Amino acid sequence: MTFSLVGRCARTRAYGAAITTSDLAVGSRCVGLAHGKGGVLSQHRTDPRLRDLGVRLLAEGASADAVLTEICGSTPDIEWRQVGVIDAQGRIAVH
């Protein structure tokens, strides 16, 4: 079983993420942060390309909903993935 979270400090606007699971080195595949813009987490059947897409979109100023829509539309295997996004305004989107 995997547990993950991503959040934003309202005072400093810093982002952070944590993930724990039975697989080794999963953090390097699942967590993506865009400095000052947001964060993306993926778990279960991870694909680092989806994380990278999310980070790029957040860095460009996309909303959490827009990022999640792009991620979901870019892979035929979205039903095998769990994704969470937080944007610069603290809005979240999950799949």
Residue ranges and their predicted role:
Residues 1-95:
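N-terminal nucleophile
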